[in-house]
Amino acid sequence: MKLTIFAATGGIGRHLVGQAIAAGHDVTAVARNPASLPAEVRAVRADLATAQPAALATAVGGADAVLSALGPRSKAEYGIASTGTRAIAGAMQVAGVRRVVVVSAAPVGAVASPRRPRPPKHDPGDGFVMRHLLSPLVNAALRDLYADLALMEDILADSGLDWTAVRPPRLTNKAETGAYRTAYGRNLRRGLTVSRADVAHLMLAVLGQPETIGQTVGIAN
């Protein structure tokens, strides 16, 4: 399969690239600073904070699917998920590429957005501790980040593309296990963490699962 991976040098992106190569995929890897990418990929330099769809056309052209691990590395980059995803979606529409899988976050199901101005107060998969203790603290601290990710999901839902958004909880650097749990449209009870490597594994796996199109997918170890 021909894959284009955005944010290919980030925490999840590095795992996506490595696992895709190991699985025998033909990989185009897009990054702001692509010097550290492995020799097996076709490297493309792009800054998704400012990129226009036309500038990404060569990166997505001919791809069977696009995977994006785009997200901010600091508060100064809040907004990059929606901005970059809008450019990626536009490039895909021009190139005639339909399948896209992105990384979102577990709290986004309860975050308001233009498309969902009145979301549920709690994600249906969250238990008591998450609903009443952890979520209020995390959501308050990272409100702008989650609003950006919610807008990103709106952009995909309105794009006409065959999208899937993976919503992990707190990310860790543990090894890939493949033993994670998943759920459509909700989070996982007692699902507090998941490794970046397992998120990458799921993102590649859903490419062969057409039932995930138009879905958010919760994941946790």
Language-model-detected regions and their locations in the chain:
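Conserved beta-loop-beta element that borders a ligand/cofactor-binding pocket
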Residues: E153-K174
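Substrate-positioning beta->alpha
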Residues: I80, G84-T85, D148, V166, ...
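Conserved Rossmann-fold cofactor-binding substructure of NAD(P)-dependent oxidoreductases
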Residues: R42-D64
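N-terminal Rossmann NAD(P)H-binding glycine-rich loop of SDR-like oxidoreductase domains
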Residues: L3-H25
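NAD(P)-cofactor binding segment of oxidoreductase domains
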Residues: R73-V102, V108, L151
